[in-house]
């Protein structure tokens, strides 16, 4: 009986210590992710589930582009506004690159709404069809910090190929 109480206490403490407002990548082995990958084709997709115990007025998604480590553009590509309605407690953000057409599809859905947009990538870049490409994203649960911008995925391109150092 004592072991059960201790185990239960540890489980409750761990649950209470987890962030209440968080975003995390959807499990790659989940049914949702496998379905999304089939629909997205060869370039794959990235899915993020968010949860918020607090109310908020808006959710913004920005697209930032960097060239040789310097930011060259920063634009808002999605805004979900909850000014006149109750904000969502949870939702899903999906980013699907289409490297052949040089676009990225962005989908956001929650209990109250759904939204989809497509944004161009590598606009005006010569020989972009020959670039090496890759993608990376957050892997663990991250606390949502209000009034800040937090990176989720990164689409990576390189004219002479793509390489990175594991850290």
Regions found by a protein language model. Name each.
Residues 1-12:
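Hydrophobic membrane-insertion alpha-helices, especially the h-region
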Residues 4, 48, 56, 99-102, ...:
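Phenylalanine-focused residue identity feature
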Residues 77-167:
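Extracytoplasmic electrostatic interaction patches
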């Amino acid at each position: 009986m004592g072991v059960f109480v201790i185990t239960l206490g540890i489980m409750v403490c761990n649950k209470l210590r987890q962030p209440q407002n968080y975003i995390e990548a959807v499990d790659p082995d989940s049914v949702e992710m496998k379905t999304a990958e089939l629909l997205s084709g060869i370039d794959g997709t990235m899915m993020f589930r968010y949860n918020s115990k607090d109310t908020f007025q808006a959710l913004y998604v920005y697209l930032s582009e960097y060239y040789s480590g310097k930011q060259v553009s920063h634009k808002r590509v999605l805004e979900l506004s909850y000014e006149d309605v109750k904000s969502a407690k949870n939702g899903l953000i999906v980013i699907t690159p289409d490297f052949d057409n040089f676009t990225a599809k962005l989908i956001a859905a929650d209990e109250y709404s759904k939204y989809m947009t497509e944004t161009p990538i590598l606009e005006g870049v010569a020989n972009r069809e020959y670039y090496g490409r890759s993608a990376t994203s957050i892997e663990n649960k991250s606390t949502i910090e209000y009034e800040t911008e937090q990176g989720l995925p990164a689409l990576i391109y390189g004219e002479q190929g793509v390489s990175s150092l594991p850290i």
